Amino acid sequence: MSKQKHSASSSRWLKEHFDDKYANEARRKGYRSRAIFKLEEIQQKDKLLKPGMTVVDLGAAPGGWSQYAIGVVGDSGRVIACDILPMDSIAGVSFLQGDFREDAVLEALLERIQPDMVDVVMSDMAPNIAGNNSVDQPRAMYLVELALDMCRQVLAPNGSFVVKVFQGEGFDEYVKEVRNMFKVVKIRKPDSSRARSREVFVVATGYKG
């Protein structure tokens, strides 16, 4: 029974992927992933990224967001990316493979950032999905809390934060926490997000420090 369910789910994902105009466009343009279009749409609306900025990208692999960000911040800017998974190199992007929940990895990440402060913290992190919302949602909320804690450590005053969050238990409390730390907070659902997905992006500007 479970095997049939898994097969049906896999078939649906494959059909969506190959019928997906964003996935097709990403392949055509040589982008790392369709996720790049989500950040592109957020950038068009909120103008988070500017030339010369320093950006931290959490959960970076396969590199779509880093690829887009370095294209905006340019040679005078910096993108520092981190992920548990490997990521092929991107010109201008400093990538650290590891779990930043571990002290040694966090220290290595902070060493790459400091003594500078960061203009934008980005997180497209998501947990491995178990298929059980009572397990998946707390895992997802734990990751977004970690991303917010990274802001507390490295984000410059008036800096910006964009994070993928799954709507569900803990979502409203999290948004309230972000509002306490930033002057302006918006919830975005990019067109390139799949309609059935619970993901939204919390976009926060004007870090109070």
Swiss-Prot record:
One of its GO terms (molecular function) is rRNA (uridine-2'-O-)-methyltransferase activity. It catalyses: uridine(2552) in 23S rRNA + S-adenosyl-L-methionine = 2'-O-methyluridine(2552) in 23S rRNA + S-adenosyl-L-homocysteine + H(+). Keywords: Cytoplasm, Methyltransferase, rRNA processing, S-adenosyl-L-methionine, Transferase. Its EC number is 2.1.1.166. It is found in: Cytoplasm. The active site is at K164. The keyword Cytoplasm applies. It is an enzyme of class 2 (transferase). GO terms for cellular component: cytoplasm. The keyword rRNA processing applies. S-adenosyl-L-methionine binds at G63, W65, D83, D99, D124. Belongs to the class I-like SAM-binding methyltransferase superfamily. RNA methyltransferase RlmE family. This is Ribosomal RNA large subunit methyltransferase E. The lineage of its organism: Bacteria, Pseudomonadati, Pseudomonadota, Gammaproteobacteria, Vibrionales.
